[in-house]
Swiss-Prot record:
Name used for this protein in its record: Putative antitoxin PF2058
Family membership noted in the UniProt record: Belongs to the UPF0165 family.
Keywords from the named record: Toxin-antitoxin system
Entry-linked SUPFAM superfamilies: AF2212/PG0164-like
Length: 65
C-alpha cells in the first residue's frame, strides 16, 4: 500500500511523486482532502508528553505522506 499526495488539475489527479506501480496496474483510490485530513489529525487522542513540539510532529506526519 502507498499513500501519496496528488494535485487535481483539469479533471486529472497528478501524483506529486513517481509511483511505484507497473504499467496498466489497476488501483483503488480513497480521496481525503486537506481539510478532512486536518479534522482527522485534530480528532486523534494523543497523550501530551512534556517536551514534545506537537506542531513539528504534525508537520513531520504531513511530510511522511
Amino acid at each position: 500500500m502507498q499513500v501519496i499526495e496528488a494535485i487535481y488539475e483539469d479533471g486529472v489527479l497528478k501524483p506529486l511523486k513517481k509511483l511505484k506501480l507497473k504499467e496498466h496496474s489497476k488501483v483503488i483510490i480513497k480521496i481525503i482532502d486537506e481539510e478532512e485530513l486536518e479534522k482527522i489529525l485534530d480528532s486523534m487522542v494523543i497523550e501530551k508528553v512534556e517536551g514534545i513540539d506537537y506542531k513539528k510532529l504534525k508537520e513531520a506526519y504531513y511530510e511522511s505522506l
